[in-house]
Amino acid sequence: MAGNLLNGLRAAIAFLTTLPVRIVDGDYDAFADRQYLFIPVAIVTGLLLGVAGTLFQCILPAPFAAVLTVACIFLLTGINHLDGLSDFGDGLIASGPREKKVRAMKDVHAGAGGLLFMAMDLLFLFALAMTFAGSPTWLFVPLLVAEGCAKVAQITIIAFGKSAHEGMGSYMIARMKKEHYLAAVIGAWIAIGIAIIGAAIIPGGGNPLRVIMAGGLAMLSPLAVALIILIISDRNFGGVNGDVIGAANEIARIAALGVMGAVLWMRF
């Protein structure tokens, strides 16, 4: 049992980050059977990004801190999810019947829709990172919360989506266990809640009630993002695939940061 858990954890790290991990036969099967492992990897990733972002925030002007923070996000998590967002954008922008949209999404070349979605992703990340970097709020908690929320959106898509076609997405969907999904969401909310409460009680972190409200709304945002993506994907592609799951990661990260940033900056 412990061996299978370790195998799954290795695959989760390799799948969700760029950290060098040696994969052996059976690791991805172990990960697919234990998809709650999305969350511990997300929390560790968020911790690393939070430390890096806060360090940049302490020693650099806000624009430079924001650029380096965004760079670290993709250096640590890779661009597989960004590529999924690009393919998702190509499929949505393509006009015509569902079959044409699916072909556009599966095309290996990035089209106008994909380039637009990637550009908007980077612009939103930069703007939101700069919003926090230039404020009294430390980047640590928003980055940690955003990574946890991104993975909650992904596993929600996997748990409740139907496969559009055979591939990595259908493989993960077929092996998702609802009890593992529930455990993952609860685990993510506990970890995020601890981080938010910590941020609220630290002196100089801003209005505690506003911090808690921002964090609470951010915790709910990946469920809303996943629901919207599921509806859009079903209408346009007849279901979800790996690209849709990857797109959910990028969109939910931005949504969580956006919700937190908006609430913390409200003048009331």
Curated annotation (Swiss-Prot):
Cofactors demanded by this protein: Mg(2+)
Top-rank taxon: Archaea
Pathway, per record: Cofactor biosynthesis; adenosylcobalamin biosynthesis; adenosylcobalamin from cob(II)yrinate a,c-diamide: step 7/7
InterPro entries found in the cross-reference section: CobS
Record membrane topology: Multi-pass membrane protein
EC number: 2.7.8.26
Places the protein is found: Cell membrane
Substrates-to-products reaction catalysed: alpha-ribazole + adenosylcob(III)inamide-GDP = adenosylcob(III)alamin + GMP + H(+); alpha-ribazole 5'-phosphate + adenosylcob(III)inamide-GDP = adenosylcob(III)alamin 5'-phosphate + GMP + H(+)
UniProtKB keywords: Cell membrane, Cobalamin biosynthesis, Magnesium, Membrane, Transferase, Transmembrane, Transmembrane helix
Enzyme class (EC, first level): transferase
Sequence intervals crossing the membrane: 1-21, 36-56, 59-79, 112-132, 138-158, 182-202, 212-232, 244-264
GO biological process: cobalamin biosynthetic process
GO molecular function: adenosylcobinamide-GDP ribazoletransferase activity; cobalamin 5'-phosphate synthase activity
One term under GO cellular component: plasma membrane
Function: Joins adenosylcobinamide-GDP and alpha-ribazole to generate adenosylcobalamin (Ado-cobalamin). Also synthesizes adenosylcobalamin 5'-phosphate from adenosylcobinamide-GDP and alpha-ribazole 5'-phosphate.
Protein family (similarity comment): Belongs to the CobS family.
Entry protein name: Adenosylcobinamide-GDP ribazoletransferase
Originating species: Methanocella arvoryzae (strain DSM 22066 / NBRC 105507 / MRE50)
Protein's gene: cobS
